[in-house]
Design a protein with these regions (language model features):
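Flexible N-terminal pre-Rossmann segment of NAD(P)-dependent oxidoreductases
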Residues: 3-9
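Class I S-adenosyl-L-methionine
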Residues: 10-71, 78, 83-103, 108-201, ...
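Short alpha-helices
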Residues: 63, 205-209, 310
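A contiguous loop/helix-start segment that scaffolds small-molecule binding in enzyme catalytic cores
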Residues: 92-95, 155, 165-170, 226, ...
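Class I SAM-dependent methyltransferase SAM-binding "motif I" and its flanking Rossmann-like core
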Residues: 102, 177-247, 290-293
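Short, hinge-like loop/turn segments at secondary-structure boundaries
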Residues: 138-141, 158, 215-221, 270, ...
Length: 344
């Protein structure tokens, strides 16, 4: 549960043990409240002075501690009471697929995992702009760009493991799906090797969702009954070009702008039709989303101004999107014409 209320300057009493109440304390502090603590119904020396009349009392569910008398006193005094969930088991890692970056494409599992985190290590392709609205955890940017890794993969794994071993609930938020060119397998292995409990929450992969944002289906009846997802981080070999060219279906390339010239030339050498349509979808589901369409013979020139993050789609399905777009534009033009005739 995240707070959308402004509690600036308000006194809020949060009950429960230090471990149980830690996330609730952060939430109310971020909402601007003056947070006071009551660890047990009788109080502990470390709790400090309590407010004479708090604006709100937050009761943290920590295994049946007897807070009922306090709740009843608050109700009698007209003091609002909020019931807060305790954090989950301490010291674990959750790998979360954040989808292509749009908040509404986060899974229910992702949204449920974020509030339970003490620290979130997030990538640049995850929906990071809205994170503060989804969790009160500490947010650590470990995002990588092609050719620029501010934090190395091994350092990311080390940070995750160290935080979990300190008893923190760690969320590793990644763009797309952790297991589709997301190095999720390596991060799971690092946790397992360190004895840290770990689970994976799948995400909406950009290999399907970003083409969809541009109206391109990766499969379409009687056009393509298969699709292949390829990493564009490194140039492919001639053998791989030949394999791809002979598969048929749709080819989806993630983060492939840097290697697009080699890929297009290699596929042509391998016998792919130079008139095969190619789409470059930049910044899918983000401000400035743009689609560039050309054929395999001219895509290097057409995509000169394109940049990552981008998804390449190679195949006849690109024509499906163009046909639908042309039909929609023609229908809109007919509607405008009909409206003008009625007004005449």
């Amino acid at each position: 549960m995240q707070l959308t209320i402004d509690l600036t300057g308000r006194d809020v009493l949060v009950t429960g043990s230090e471990k149980s109440a830690r996330q609730a304390v952060r939430r109310y502090q971020r909402a601007g409240a003056n947070v006071y603590r009551l660890s047990t119904p009788e109080g502990l020396p470390g709790d400090g002075q309590l407010p004479e009349r708090p604006f709100l009392v937050a009761i943290v569910d920590d295994s049946g501690t007897g807070w009922l008398p306090l709740v009843e006193r608050c109700r009698d005094a007209g003091i609002p009471v909020a019931f807060e969930p305790a954090p989950g088991a301490e010291g674990h890692v959750t790998l979360v697929g954040g989808g292509p970056g749009a908040l509404d494409l986060l899974t229910v599992g992702a949204v449920d995992a974020l509030p339970d985190a003490d620290v979130v290590f997030y990538d640049r392709l995850a929906p990071c702009q809205e994170l503060a609205d989804l969790t009160s955890a500490d947010l650590v940017d470990v995002g990588k760009q092609p050719g620029l890794h501010k934090v190395t993969q091994r350092d990311i794994e080390k940070l995750m493991v160290e935080a979990a071993l300190l008893g923190k609930n760690v969320v590793r938020l990644k763009g797309g799906d952790p297991y589709v060119f997301g190095r999720g397998g390596e991060e799971v292995a690092a946790c397992v090797a360190a004895g840290v409990p770990v689970r994976v929450i799948s995400g909406v992969t950009s290999a399907i969702s970003v083409p969809a944002a541009a109206g391109i289906p990766v499969t379409h009846r009687e056009v393509s009954h298969m699709f292949t997802v390829v990493s564009g981080h490194a140039p492919l070999t001639e053998k791989e070009h030949t394999h791809l060219a002979g598969l048929g279906g749709t080819i989806v390339v993630l983060m492939g702008i840097g290697t697009l010239p080699q890929l297009a030339a290699g596929l042509r050498r391998a016998g792919m039709d130079p008139e095969m349509p190619v789409a470059v979808v930049e910044r899918g589901y983000r401000p400035g989303q743009r689609t560039t369409i050309a054929d395999l013979g001219t895509i290097e020139t057409a995509a000169t101004g394109c940049s990552n993050p981008a998804v390449l789609v190679i195949g006849e399905v690109v024509r499906v999107a163009e046909a639908n777009r042309n039909h929609a534009e023609a229908s809109a033009e007919l509607s405008r014409l009909a409206a003008s005739l009625l007004e005449a």
